[in-house]
Amino acid sequence: MKQICILGSTGSIGTQALDVIEQHSDRYEVYCLTANNRYEMLAEQARKFRPAAVVIANEAHYESLKLLLADLPDIKVYAGAKAIDEIVEAHPIDMVLTAMVGFAGLSPTIHAIKARKTICLANKETLVVAGDLICRLAAEYHVNILPVDSEHSAIFQSLVGEGDNEIEKILLTASGGPFRKFTLDEMRDVKAADALRHPTWEMGAKITIDSASMMNKGFEVIEAKWLFGVEAEKIQVLVHPQSIVHSAVQFRDGGVKAQLGVPDMRLPIQYAFSFPERLPLNGDRLDLFRQPLEFFEPDMEKFRCLAMAYESIRRGGNVPCVMNAANEVVNEAFRHDRCGFLQMADIIEATMQRATFVAQPTYDDYIASDAEARRIAASML
C-alpha cells in the first residue's frame, strides 16, 4: 500500500488524483493533504480520505480548519509554508504529488527530494525556476521524478524501453488555446473570462491563462529540457487543437513514438502513481473516427511568451526564474482586470531585461530573483 502526500489537493490536479486513489483504494492511501486557501474543501477531503495530517498554507485559516475537523482528533492539523516543508519529510510517505501552483512548489519539492520521496511532478514551475538544482538534487539523493503533465508523461511513456537510444527531437504538442485563430487586434481586447474558456482541458485558473498566452507551453519546453536532458533546439512545439496526440519522440533512425488518448489528466496522474504498471481507469476511450488530427506551427509573433521561454533558456542562469515570477504577477493581474492580455508579454519581457542576472544561481539566489522580479513586474501595472 503506497502512502501518498498531495500538495495542492483542492486544485484541478489534486482532486483528479484523489479520484484515482479512490478507484484504487486497495493500492493507495492518502497520508497528507495540503491546500492554500480552500480550508472548507480541504476539510471535506479529509473527512472522506482520513489522512494522517492536513496542512493549510494560509495560516489565517488554521483555526477554522481545526474547528471543522475537531471531531476527528486522529487527523493532525497544521498551517504555514514551513509545515508543508516538514510534512513531506514524514517517514511513512512513499510519493509526493506536487500539484500546488507556482513558485510555492519549489521549497517542498526540495524537502521531499532530500527525504528521498518519489516525486510525481505536476508543479512545472519548480523545473522552470530551478531545473538545474532540482535535477542535481534528484541525482544526489537517487530520487525518481515522474512527470504528471500530460505532454511530459507522453514523452516519458514514449521513452519506455528505449534505453540509451538517442533522441533526435521531441515533438511537444499544444492545443493552441482559445485565441489560436485570433488576430493581434482581437487579442488586445480579450478579458479573463474569454481566456478561461479552454477548448479541450479542464484546468485551474492560473494554468488556463498561461495556456491562452502559450506561456504554459514555454514552461513545458523548459520542463522537457530538464526532465529528458534535451537541448531546447531539439524541442519542437506543434499546435494540435484536438489534444489527442499528447506528445511524441523522434529517434535518430527517423522513427517516431507518440502517446495518444482522450484529454483526461487522470491518466498521466495514475501512470505516475503506478509506473511501470498500467492499472484500469474508468473514463472515455479514444475513438479515432470521430475527428481529424491537425497540426500547425505556433505563431511566435502572436504568442510572444513562447518565444520568451526559448530566449530564457538561451540566456540561462536565473532568467527563467525571473520570467516565471513576472508571469505569476501579470497572470494574477489579468485575472483581476488590472492588466491587458498582450500587456502581459510586454511586462514579462521588460522584467527579464531589468532584473539582476545571476549566471549560476544558488537556492538563495532563486528566492532573491523571484522577489526582485515580482517587484519590477508589479511596478509596471
For each predicted feature, which ranges?
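Catalytic, metal-anchored helix/loop core of enzyme active sites in primary metabolism
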Residues: 1-381
